[in-house]
């Protein structure tokens, strides 16, 4: 009888999907390739492509704009997590790309709980090609890695 009562009470509770809102912070770039040509505009476009790809590939994601992040001075982890939390995000995605040569790049991605500050997921990915398509593919791959880790 207790099991029946417990089942009825549990059925009356609102269903939760467990979906977590993910705030994607602006991607940062460390360029150590020493290329002579100034590629700041190309790199900014590619970082935006990466963020937009993640936004389209991750359920319940939102972009936290650079203008919002600029209110954190200095940009401490606590301040950035607070911005994400204030935006309604349960998790914040921090990404740093490192360009080591004209062809080789790495992504360091960390998903952090905005309430506790605990690291949920960390991925270090290598990819080749400093062009729009390579950054887009890297974004899709990272999103897939995040989905698989959450299953």
Question: What are the roles of these predicted feature ranges?
Answer:
Residues 1-4:
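Positively charged n-region of N-terminal signal peptides that target proteins for export
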Residues 6-7, 17:
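Cleavable N-terminal signal peptides
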Residues 10-11:
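Hydrophobic alpha-helical transmembrane segments of integral membrane proteins
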Residues 19-32, 49-53, 60, 83-86, ...:
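C-terminal/domain-edge helix-coil "capping" segments
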Residues 35-49:
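Glycine- and acidic-residue-enriched helix-capping/strand-helix junction motifs
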Residues 37-39, 107-110:
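Short, glycine/charged-enriched secondary-structure capping and boundary segments
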Residues 57-94:
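Short, solvent-exposed, polar/charged sequence segments at loop or secondary-structure edges
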